[in-house]
C-alpha cells in the first residue's frame, strides 16, 4: 500500500493533540454519554463503550476521568440528547471531506461547518456526495520502540484478524474491518501494547495529492473544524506533500 503517506504527520498531529487535550477530553466525554445512553454503563456488555474507552486511552485520558465520565453519563437521566450527524463536502482543490458531529443544536452545527468549508474555498454538499469514496475501517497506530519486533507485531495483528499492517516512519499501522476491530484491539492490548490511535474511521479508497499552497489552505479549514466543540471527527482524502508540516 504505497503511493501515499497516510501516517507521515502522526507525530506533528500528536503535538497538536497534546496542546488541545482538554478539548479532546470534552469531545470524548460526549461520546461516552452517547455510548452509555445506547448500551448502558458496563463496558463488558457495551461494545460501543469499549471502543470509546480505547479511543480515550489512546489520547491519554486518565482512567479516573474515564470512570467519572461513565458514572456521570449513567446518572444523568435528563442528560443532553446529542444527535449524530455527518456532513459531506469538498475542500480546496476538490478534496473529499466527511465531518462527524455530536450536537444538541443541528442548526448551529450546520452553520459552523458550512462556514469552515466556504472560508477556505470549499463547499458543503448533499448527503452521499463523497461518502461513497470512503470505507469504515478500524485503525490502530503503535509507536515504534526499542524491543518491539516488527515481524512479531505483524504476525500478532494478522493472527488476530487484521486486514493490513504497515511500517512507516516512526509508527506501525494496523487496519481491520469494522467488525473485527474490537477483537484485534483487545488481542494487542492483552500483549501490553499502547496505542497512539485506536478507533474506527472512514478511510478513503484513493488519495488526492495536493500542493503546499492547497495544503496550507486545507489545514486552516481542518483547524477551524477540529476546534469546533460539536465536531467529533474529520475525514478526508488529501495526500499532503512529502515533508510538509502543519
From Swiss-Prot:
GO cellular component: cytosol
A Pfam family hit: Transcrip_reg
Localization terms from the record: Cytoplasm
One GO BP: regulation of DNA-templated transcription
Record's keyword terms, sorted: Cytoplasm, DNA-binding, Transcription, Transcription regulation
Domain of life: Bacteria
GO terms, molecular function: DNA binding
SUPFAM superfamilies linked to this entry: YebC-like
NCBIfam families attached to this UniProt entry: PRK00110.1, PRK12378.1, YebC/PmpR family DNA-binding transcriptional regulator
HAMAP family, sorted: Transcrip_reg_TACO1
PANTHER family: TRANSCRIPTIONAL REGULATORY PROTEIN YEBC-RELATED, TRANSLATIONAL ACTIVATOR OF CYTOCHROME C OXIDASE 1
Family label: Belongs to the TACO1 family.
Name of the protein in question: Probable transcriptional regulatory protein CBO3073/CLC_2975
Organism in which the protein naturally occurs: Clostridium botulinum (strain Hall / ATCC 3502 / NCTC 13319 / Type A)
